[in-house]
From Swiss-Prot:
Gene3D superfamilies: 3.30.1320.10. This is Small ribosomal subunit protein bS16. It comes from Neisseria meningitidis serogroup B (strain ATCC BAA-335 / MC58). InterPro entries: Ribosomal_bS16 (IPR000307), Ribosomal_bS16_dom_sf (IPR023803). Keywords: Ribonucleoprotein, Ribosomal protein. Belongs to the bacterial ribosomal protein bS16 family. One of its GO terms (biological process) is translation.
Length: 81
């Protein structure tokens, strides 16, 4: 099954997440099919907090990809902004 979920990056105490499309059997930070955005939970006012490629997200969702709960919240947050 193909899923859209977060892969952690960054350093200790400075998390940074990539929004990726991957096979559900792959590890959290392992192999992925495509990177469709990012989420920076510790962004300040000058930095971008969330960026998602809506075209590619819609493409993968139409192909049957399942969206994780955390990514669904980010999509909802970006649509509201």
């Amino acid at each position: 099954m193909v899923v859209i979920r977060l892969a952690r990056g960054g350093s200790k105490h400075r998390p940074f997440y990539n929004v990726i499309v991957t096979d559900s059997r792959s590890r959290r930070d392992g192999r992925f099919i495509e990177r469709v955005g990012f989420y920076n939970p510790v962004a300040n006012e000058k930095q971008e907090r969330v960026r998602l490629n809506a075209d590619r997200l819609n493409h993968w969702i139409a192909q049957g990809a399942q969206v994780s709960d955390s990514v669904a919240k980010l999509i909802k947050e970006q649509k509201a902004a």
